[in-house]
Amino acid sequence: MLPKVIVHNSISLDGSLTNFEPNMELHYQIAGSFKPNAHLIGSNTIEAGVELYEDGVPPEEEKDFEKPQRDGSLPYWVIPDTSGKLQGLLHTCRRFEFCRDIILLLSEKTPKEYVEHLRERNY
């Protein structure tokens, strides 16, 4: 059986994906209504979201080093980040209430320091 793929984006009335501020709570409520197992989210999207919606990056806390224990019906966030761009930002994703946990897609060229950083935080 092939997986069912749904593309869900928030866009402005003129079709733009940039230069507007979407209601992310509504975005993820709608996305969640499809009952997905996972969301594929780009590292640029994560980086832009942290800049747009966070008042600076909060410091990591002890609980950020543990896998969250959330409802199993929530989707995983699958994020390609082979360069380590999101080092120091991923804990903000893990705290997001509509995210079960983070799955990172890496490559053989991913910096070893980043891989160790992820291991220390149980990603």
Stretch-by-stretch model annotation:
Residues 99-123:
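Histidine/lysine/aspartate-rich catalytic loop segments that bind and position anionic ligands
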Residues 1-95, 99:
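N-terminal nucleotide/polyanion-binding subdomain common to many enzyme families
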